[in-house]
Every structure is written in structure tokens, then in C-alpha cells.
Amino acid sequence: MAAPGENRRVNADRLWDSLMEMAKIGPGVAGGNNRQTLTDADGEGRRLFQSWCEEAGLSMGVDKMGTMFLTRPGTDPDALPVHIGSHLDTQPTGGKFDGVLGVLSGLEAVRTMNDLGIKTKHPIVVTNWTNEEGARFAPAMLASGVFAGVHTLEYAYARKDPEGKSFGDELKRIGWLGDEEVGARKMHAYFEYHIEQGPILEAENKQIGVVTHCQGLWWLEFTLTGREAHTGSTPMDMRVNAGLAMARILEMVQTVAMENQPGAVGGVGQMFFSPNSRNVLPGKVVFTVDIRSPDQAKLDGMRARIEAEAPKICERLGVGCSIEAVGHFDPVTFDPKLVETVRGAAEKLGYSHMNLVSGAGHDACWAAKVAPTTMIMCPCVGGLSHNEAEDISREWAAAGADVLFHAVLETAEIVE
């Protein structure tokens, strides 16, 4: 006789309906969402999620970072829980699925267990981490970072948004300051299901990404100092052009990333010119280089080479150059046993799959410091994310949720 839940699927329609219902909260201007952390919309989304969880029989705990832990009890009171987590907060111009898919698929896994009358030895905890995005309060993955001991609670509370409001004050204001000590919970395992946020799965026509690693990164902030001058009347050989120096550094970063394949990336997404006038050569340019690799030695080698070559480029142009490392985390290797559990679930269910390295940071990257951890990914249309046009299909969402359901059941141990 088949074991409870054997080859069963989650309720795809219920999952999709929940995603669409959550997306009504904090609507964006172009079909996505603006539900930034600790806003009124975030509070409303949390309350909706809480109500769904309580309807499913889960009990809630909230820690001093506002992270929500919704627990389905296991049969063994001494067994550590299996966590399923992600985030409900979004970018200012975010999509409906980034983070939200993982949280609501965790809830759907529990709902399906209830439907099938499944009991597990280990408790199941569905987790909504606070401020994963870092869009309003930098840095990203803040609550999971405090949980893992990367940041202090005091540091987190002192983070300020662009309006000068502090994380701690806003956490109190929306009513989600809990009393549970951050990091007090111990985990048997941690699973996170997420959209890929890249184009590989769709291009390869695969339904499931089995995530083996998270890339490490360095963020290097450059300040280049040139001389403001008229773009029309300053001869080419008499310019001290900070903008030209930046362009040559960007080309060098591209070369360094290409020479450190496979897996390395590098680029610039933020830059500021001063005085930023169309007919004035910039006297100052500030920009941030983002380099990533799943290989620690390559990552550190890329940083060293960029920091060595950039000043030489600037010196040849007479431009001043200073570099500050403003962000970093090491590459993460996910738990091999859990990775194989995910792969086995995909194979059992007949879903096409491939290994992936996550190019983006996730709460799972910090969870891996304190518990066996892995991730599951599904495709997203065109690889778009952090964009209101972010989209997935109902079938993609359900396939990953099915794999999550079976991988969690195997790890939490069904009691017959």
C-alpha cells in the first residue's frame, strides 16, 4: 500500500488563488506590487497570511525582528522543526511572486498535509522573514542575518529608510515587534522555494532548479575625482574626465568576470555623476561594482584584480580613485543530503530538473549558517524579477510546490 502522500500533488488552484489574493495588497503601478517592509501594506499582508495559517491550524510566534513563525506540531515533542521560509515584502516596483511564492507554498504544503491526514514526526514551521529585500532598510536579508548572528539586533533597529525612519520604530508602529529572542529557534532543516530570477530554467525548458550553491559577492564603491569643465570648449588632451575613467573600469570589470567563468558575474547597477549636467565633464563619479561567484578563491581574486587595476586606469587619466568595500557575503554550499532529497522528489514526480547556482542572495544563505539548508527554484518568464512584469505560470508554481511538499515530508518523516 502506498504511503500517505505518495505521488500526491498540492492543490495548484488553491495556491494560485492565494498568490493572487496576496497580490491585491500593496498594488504597484504596472501590475506588480509595492509592499515594502514595515509599511502599512506589509502589515496588511502579514495579517492575511496569519489568518490563513490559523485557519490551517498553525500557531504563531513572532520574534524581535518581526519574523513570523507558524507551526504545525509534530508527533515527537523533542524533534526539531523543519522550516519552510521566504518573505512577503517586495521591491518598490516588485512582482507578485518573488519571496511570496515560497511563503505561500509552505502554507500550501501544510494545507495539503491536512487534506491528506498526514502526520509528521518533526514539526513544520512556515516562516516569513522580515526585510529580505532591503529596498527600504539596507542591508537585504536583515532579519535572517540577525537570526544567524551576522548582524546584531541593535544594528538592525538603527537602520534608516530614505525618510530617516528607523527599522525599530517602524517595526513597533505596524504592530509586529514580537517578544521571542532572535535566533532562539533551532532547526532540523530549512527549505526555501523561490522563482529563479534569471533566464536559465526557461531557456533550458526545465521545470525545477535544484539549487546547490548561492554565489558570494563583493560590492565595491568607487569614488572617482576629476575636474569639472565645459564639454564643448575643453580640448580632449586637457581633460581630467572621471566619466571616461568609470567607463574604462566598467570594461575592465566585464573582462575580469568573463575570465573567471564558469559562474562569475560582474557589473554596475548604480552610479552618480556630479554635477550631472549635459555640458559639464563630471568632477566626481560614484558607482558600485557588484561581483559574484560561487567559488571563494575566484571571488576574492576578482576583487583583488579590480582593486589593483582600477587605480592604474585612473592614474593614466589623471583621475583620483578611492575604493571601499560596502557589502560582502561568502559563497554558500547547500546541504548535500537535502539537495539530493529535492532532486529525488523531482525525479519521483516526473519533473524535469537541473542544478542551479543562485545568483541572488536569499534568506537561505544566512539560514545555512545555522541549519542544514537547501533551495528549490521554478522558472520565471524571460528571467525577469525585481520588475512589475515578473511572471510565472500556474503550472511552474505548482511543480515547485509539489517538490517542496515531498522533500519536506521526507525530511520531517511521515508517521503512519
UniProtKB/Swiss-Prot annotation:
It catalyses: an N-carbamoyl-L-alpha-amino acid + H2O + 2 H(+) = an L-alpha-amino acid + NH4(+) + CO2; N-carbamoyl-L-methionine + H2O + 2 H(+) = L-methionine + NH4(+) + CO2; N-acetyl-L-methionine + H2O = L-methionine + acetate; N(alpha)-formyl-L-methionine + H2O = formate + L-methionine. An N-carbamoyl-L-alpha-amino acid binds at Q197, H230, N279, R292, G361. The keyword GTP-binding does not apply. One of its GO terms (biological process) is amino acid biosynthetic process. GO terms for molecular function: hydrolase activity, acting on carbon-nitrogen (but not peptide) bonds, in linear amidines; metal ion binding; N-carbamoyl-L-amino-acid hydrolase activity. Strongly inhibited by Hg(2+), Cu(2+), Zn(2+), Pb(2+) and Fe(3+) ions, and slightly inhibited by Na(+) and K(+) ions. Beta-mercaptoethanol and 5,5'-dithiobis-(2-nitrobenzoic acid)(DTNB) cause 34% and 42% inhibition, respectively. Optimum temperature is 60 degrees Celsius. Shows a low thermostability, retaining only 20% activity after incubation at 50 degrees Celsius for 30 minutes. A divalent metal cation 1 binds at H87, D98, H194. The keyword Cytoplasm does not apply. The record marks R239 as: Necessary for dimerization. It holds the Pfam family M20_dimer. Its EC number is 3.5.1.87. It is an enzyme of class 3 (hydrolase). Its cofactor is Mn(2+); Ni(2+); Co(2+); Fe(2+). Homodimer. Belongs to the peptidase M20 family. This is N-carbamoyl-L-amino-acid amidohydrolase. The lineage of its organism: Bacteria, Pseudomonadati, Pseudomonadota, Alphaproteobacteria, Hyphomicrobiales. The gene is hyuC.
